């Protein structure tokens, strides 16, 4: 047998020797009030999932069953979701989804100071308990489908000590990401974090090669790198500190996302979204209602698991002639719609829409009640909101700007506290669990 074949890394051994760490402590400040009470990875998405379900499902589908989720900001709903929806792995076989909340292990006066510090503060557990050969580090707040085992194979085959996932993005958007340049072997030759003037790809003046915030490390090199950047004058961040270090050491390689993207549509397009703003969150949800969306959430070959609410079937009641009904929308379980119009929208579980109301291009989170004769257009309605009879949202943006929050692209966010203030009620009366 060919020696090159004999020396190829074994996928089963690689995933068995790998620990996954999902960074899920971020607040998501650009989502404003939508993440006031929940971490960004715990935010609802696609009718009956949460954002973190994509990273977790990618792990399970890739054969990676040793997972730690690092949490910090507003973690209660995220921890409950992990406990109720992701506790099915058999621990007797060494498989788990463990929760690693911020516990101020190194310094009693500080929480995690950055993405790299969140891993550094858990090194005692990682080294002493998990003892991995490789560590895969993921952001818990992106929407995509990816076979991480392919990235692991590429990492080992290249001889890298650190591999970063990358994707081609429009140059004007690249200032929000780490941007790199690579040679013909995919060795990274330059890396800059969130540049104001992103460098273009060779031969593609309008595109940049952006970091996806996905990293594979040889465990020993990760420990060494984290120890080297723990000085007070660093940002304790993978993009700002660890990537430049690996670049200078000559051990940093790139993994193009199109090598491991799963669930492409009929046109072969790849899909990866950072839903870090109100506009991108709204758009990513609305994208799902098209006939052939770029992201196929119905694909059973690469399923996105979660913890769907056990609800009764949704009910649609129409007894008025010429009443426009429901078209091009996603409707989760437990919804009640009576003589109302819904188009190009996403309704999460247990939403009620009363007679005469119209919903267009909107994202309605769980347990929202919409009164009679309401008009909702291009808006995001947060969980538990009760829209009073006759209210119009998204129709007069000048009026909405005095009551709610309006995004750069004119999407209106409505939360329970905003309506309470509008009605003169005490915001402190809110006591819902997310």
From Swiss-Prot:
Keyword terms of this UniProt record: ATP-binding, Carbohydrate metabolism, Glycogen biosynthesis, Glycogen metabolism, Nucleotide-binding, Nucleotidyltransferase, Transferase
User: What does the subunit comment say?
Assistant: Homotetramer.
Provide the GO MF annotations for this entry. ATP binding; glucose-1-phosphate adenylyltransferase activity
What is the protein's given name? Glucose-1-phosphate adenylyltransferase
What InterPro entries does this protein map onto? ADP-Glc_PPase, ADP_Glu_pyroP_CS, GlgC_bac, GlmU/GlgC-like_hexapep, NTP_transferase_dom, Nucleotide-diphossugar_trans, Trimer_LpxA-like_sf
* Gene (UniProt): glgC
What is the residue range of the signal peptide feature?
A: none
The UniProt entry's sequence similarity note says: Belongs to the bacterial/plant glucose-1-phosphate adenylyltransferase family.
Give a Pfam family name. Hexapep_GlmU
Explain the purpose of this protein.
Involved in the biosynthesis of ADP-glucose, a building block required for the elongation reactions to produce glycogen. Catalyzes the reaction between ATP and alpha-D-glucose 1-phosphate (G1P) to produce pyrophosphate and ADP-Glc.
Provide the residue positions that the database annotates as binding alpha-D-glucose 1-phosphate. Answer: 112, 178, 193-194, 211
Name the Enzyme Commission number(s) assigned to this protein.
2.7.7.27
């Amino acid at each position: 047998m060919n020696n090159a074949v004999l020396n190829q890394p074994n996928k089963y051994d690689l995933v068995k020797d790998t620990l996954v760490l999902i960074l899920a402590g971020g607040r998501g400040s650009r989502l404003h009030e939508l993440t006031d009470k929940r971490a960004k990875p715990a935010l609802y998405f696609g009718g009956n999932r949460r954002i973190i379900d994509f990273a977790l499902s990618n792990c399970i589908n890739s054969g990676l069953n040793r997972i730690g989720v690092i949490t910090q900001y507003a973690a209660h709903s995220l921890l409950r979701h992990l406990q109720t929806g992701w506790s099915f792995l058999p621990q007797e076989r060494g498989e788990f989804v463990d929760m690693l909340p911020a516990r101020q292990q190194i310094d009693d006066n500080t929480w995690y100071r950055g993405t790299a510090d969140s891993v550094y503060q858990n090194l005692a557990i990682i080294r002493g308990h998990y003892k991995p050969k490789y560590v895969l580090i993921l952001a818990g707040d992106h929407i995509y489908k990816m076979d991480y085992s392919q990235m692991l194979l590429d990492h080992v085959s290249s001889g890298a000590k650190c591999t970063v996932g990358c994707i081609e993005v429009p140059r004007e958007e690249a200032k929000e990401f780490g941007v790199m340049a690579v040679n013909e072997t995919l060795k990274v030759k330059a890396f800059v974090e969130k540049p104001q003037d992103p460098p273009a790809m060779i031969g593609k003046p309008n595109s940049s090669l952006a970091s996806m915030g996905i990293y594979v490390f040889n465990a020993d090199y990760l420990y060494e790198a984290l120890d080297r950047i723990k000085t007070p004058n660093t940002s304790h961040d993978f993009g700002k500190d660890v990537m430049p270090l690996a670049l200078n050491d000559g051990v940093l390689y790139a993994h193009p996302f199109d090598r491991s993207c799963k669930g492409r549509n009929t046109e072969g397009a790849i899909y990866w979204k950072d839903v870090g703003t109100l506009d991108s969150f709204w758009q990513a949800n609305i994208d799902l209602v098209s006939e052939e969306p770029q992201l196929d959430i119905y694909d059973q070959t690469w399923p996105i698991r979660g913890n769907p609410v056990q609800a009764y079937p949704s009910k649609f009641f129409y007894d008025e002639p010429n009443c426009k009904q429901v078209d091009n929308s996603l409707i989760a379980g437990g919804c009640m719609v009576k003589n109302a119009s819904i188009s190009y929208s996403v309704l999460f579980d247990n939403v009620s829409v009363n007679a005469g109301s119209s919903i267009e291009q909107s994202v309605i989170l769980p347990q929202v009640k919409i009164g009679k004769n309401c008009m909702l257009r291009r808006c995001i309605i947060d969980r538990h909101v009760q829209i009073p009879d006759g209210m119009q949202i998204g129709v007069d943006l000048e009026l909405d700007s005095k009551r709610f929050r309006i995004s750069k692209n004119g999407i209106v966010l409505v939360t329970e506290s905003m309506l309470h203030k509008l009605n003169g009620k005490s915001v402190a009366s809110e006591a819902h669990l997310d």
